[in-house]
């Protein structure tokens, strides 16, 4: 008697992501996976485990470290990489500043976020990477929504939205010339809710700041920023302590928290399911510089 074989949404997304990772491992000589210790890159690393175990993950992981990251996330990054036995490459924005490759911003709105582009491109060149896995998703932001899964970057590391390759079904064009590379986004079709559902299903450990906790914050442009030594707080920005969590993590100078009491994965899932604002739209000050802030950065070589 025939039986129906049904795959859940997560099973379909997982299979697609694993296929993409195996395709890259087979077609490129020197791939790497961007791993910041955030929830999306944690899911990416879990998918890489599934794609290649019982063998070792056949590429290193890399983090572009601004030096202004949350301690909880950096500690998790180092511990997780050590547990898996993967090679962790840390590309430092501070090293780029010291070498005169970039100039640090000053003033109230200063951030190292944009400076990461130069550090990233230098690391790609130094390590001769020809493919780089990223954890970007189409539901995050409109520039990422129109980017291909296999995103071509020219010899300068730049992205041209008008020069994207057709992607038919699960067929990907991996051909590049010397000096060019491909940014690959295996979880491009996932949503924030899918990520959390997968974290729950796979029982993945994530940094504690993704759950509700008390933190001293101040409000700037509608965003709750953590009090820290890297941000110049104005006299009109009083500090207060409240219960928050982070939907996304990045540079402390431009990543905001959200008011929340969600202290478990199930509670976070319920909260995400009810929200009508994207995580970057609600919490990322770096995306508010202009209407096309993300696309402008990506054109220059950003993640």
Name the predicted role of every residue range.
Residues 1-303:
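Nucleotide-activated chemistry modules centered on ATP-dependent adenylation/adenylyltransferase
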């Amino acid at each position: 008697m025939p039986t129906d074989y049904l795959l859940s949404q997560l099973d379909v997304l997982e299979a697609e992501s694993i296929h993409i990772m195996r395709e890259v491992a087979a077609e490129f000589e020197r791939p790497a996976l961007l791993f910041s210790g955030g929830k999306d890159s944690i899911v990416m690393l879990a998918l890489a485990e599934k794609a290649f175990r019982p063998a070792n993950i056949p590429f290193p992981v890399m983090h572009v470290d601004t030096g202004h990251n949350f301690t909880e996330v950096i500690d998790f990054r180092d511990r997780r990489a050590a547990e898996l036995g993967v090679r962790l490459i840390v590309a430092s924005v501070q090293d780029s500043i010291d070498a005169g490759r970039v100039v640090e911003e000053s003033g109230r709105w200063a951030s190292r976020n944009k400076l990461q582009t130069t550090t990233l491109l230098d690391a790609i060149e130094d390590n001769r990477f020809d493919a780089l896995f990223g954890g970007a998703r189409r539901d995050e932001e409109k520039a990422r929504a129109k980017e291909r899964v296999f995103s071509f970057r020219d010899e300068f590391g730049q992205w041209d939205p008008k020069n994207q390759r057709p992607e038919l079904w699960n067929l990907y064009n991996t051909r590049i010339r010397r000096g060019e590379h491909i940014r690959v986004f295996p979880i491009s079709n996932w949503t924030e809710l899918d990520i959390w559902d997968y974290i729950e299903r796979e029982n993945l450990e994530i940094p504690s700041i993704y759950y509700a906790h008390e933190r001293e914050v101040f409000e700037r442009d509608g965003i709750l920023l953590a009090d820290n030594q890297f941000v110049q707080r104005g006299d009109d920005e009083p500090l207060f302590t409240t219960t928050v969590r982070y939907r996304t993590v990045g540079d402390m100078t431009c990543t905001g928290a959200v008011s929340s009491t969600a202290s478990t994965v199930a509670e976070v899932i319920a909260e995400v399911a009810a929200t009508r604002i994207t995580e970057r739209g609600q919490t990322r000050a770096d995306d508010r510089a202009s209407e096309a802030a993300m696309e402008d950065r990506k054109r220059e070589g950003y993640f």
